[in-house]
Amino acid sequence: EYAIKSFVAATKALKEGIVDVLVTAPINKYNIQSESFKFPGHTDYLAQELEGDALMLMVSDNLRVGLLTDHVPLNEVAGHLTEELIKKKIETVKQSLIRDFSINKPKIAVLGLNPHCGDGGVIGSEDDAVLKPTLKKIFDKGTLVFGPFPADSFFGSNHYEKYDAIIATYHDQGLIPFKTLSFGRGVNYTAGLDKV
């Protein structure tokens, strides 16, 4: 009860300019649920309370991982991957890299949804039908976005080191390698908002 009251009060203080920055700690998503708080986590609440397009961006010394979908059950992820969502999330990551990390021409990699990016439709059609054409449109307009890349080999081959940020299609696809590679030194930065 006190965790959520503290979080709500701190968010209010941030909105009112009483504090400059909000730093949060992990909270138990089950314990915070109530009639007045029905959000799966910090990012979702901050998205409602602050201006901008909130995005979970995991940050460590040499790795940044954003998510196209965050607290979405795995069996619903494919239905959430629309051209509009992909464009919005990539733009949010790009602007955060420019504004918050001083990277003028960021290179962004996007991971595929299905094993082996669908193997030409044999293991799912979302990578060919949605991700590839959307990424091409974004790239053709000048954003250095690449992919989709097969997620199973992307991190193990150190391919991630060539990019300023990686965007995973779903929560565990991005957070498992991030937490493994950051060795407990990473943080969840809520990008895309008018406040830090």
List the model feature ranges, each with a label:
Residues 1-126, 131-196:
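Anion-binding alpha/beta catalytic cores of soluble intermediary-metabolism enzymes, centered on
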